[in-house]
Amino acid sequence: VVRYDYKGIEGLQLSANYNFGQRHNDKGRALTPGLKNAFGFGALYTAGDLDARFAYGHTNLETNATYKHRVDGFLASLGYKFGDFKLTGDFGYAHVKFDDAKTNKFYVSPGFAYQVTPASQVYGNYLYERVKGEADKDKTHGFLLGADYKLHKQVVLFVEGKYVTT
């Protein structure tokens, strides 16, 4: 991987990367399918209580045939903090092409976090996801609610519950 980060403007970070081919994971096991190459770029902007992020990625996967297998996707996230209460919104889209088959994926996930004490917070979000292939269309709705407690700067206990329907 080759990566470049630009941090010349206060509150703004721009990043770009190129991933070379990879046929094995970190433990030496074969990846199926292998990574032919990939690139991505993103931007993070923070000003006061506002946090905005955007990323785009393109991945070419290896095939042993003449057709292509690729994945394109983007992610956008926006968050704003009102004292101890934070609202967030995540949005994503992916397009997968495998030979002549195409699949489009979309999700939106608004959420919140409330800092109850300096060591504890409650958080939750809603998820709507749609996956549309050549012949099928699936929708998912989900809710997540959780709480955490920070015992130490590197130790956090948490409990979460979720409900998902398709």
Model-derived regions: residue spans:
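Surface-exposed coil loops of outer-membrane beta-barrel proteins
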Residues: V1-F39
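Outer-membrane beta-barrel biogenesis signature
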Residues: V1, L151-F158, T166
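Short loop/turn motifs that connect adjacent beta-strands in outer-membrane beta-barrel proteins
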Residues: E10-G11, A119, Q154
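Detector for outer-membrane/organellar transmembrane beta-barrel domains
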Residues: P33-L144, Y149-K150, K162-Y163
